[in-house]
Amino acid sequence: MIARRAFSVAVYARRGARVLVIEHRRLATWLPIGGELEAGETPLEAAARELREETGMAGEFRVLAGALDGVPPGLIGYEEHQAGSKGLHMNFVFVARVADDVDVTPNDEFGAWRWVTRRELDDLASPLNVRQFGYLALDADWA
């Protein structure tokens, strides 16, 4: 049995044919926006909060084409992995549409950010699942 579990979200902010990735200071890799759920928060609420807190942007989380009843708007996937002292890390992955005229407000959690295309995702120095979910975010079709 796993002693501890951590629930988190990842958010791919999408602007047309590009998604936002950040260079995470502590982990030294390119990732989507994200963080852990706070007490009483749903994954969707956490996704909206993390996007706002880490970038200053509001996202539009819409129901995706083909989504089943009860699936939160913008949910593109789920993954889990062992995360050291945090135990099992359970991560809900979302895509949110963001406005073209609003840019990222820098944050102390990341050193740099980029809006990347599918081709740029191919060469991104990041874990494979980050690129795979990035492709899903770019392919997401709003209902």
What are the functions of these language-model segments?
Residues 14-19, 27-28, 38, 68-73, ...:
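Short, charged/polar surface micro-motifs in flexible loops or helix N-caps
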Residues 7-8, 45, 89, 108-110:
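A short beta-loop-beta micro-motif enriched in histidine and acidic residues
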Residues 22:
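Conserved active-site beta-strand element of glycosyltransferases/polysaccharide synthases
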Residues 25-30, 91, 95-143:
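Nudix hydrolase/Nudix homology domain
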Residues 32-68:
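The catalytic Nudix box helix
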Residues 1-19, 36-39, 93:
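Conserved N-terminal beta-strand and adjoining loop/helix that marks the start
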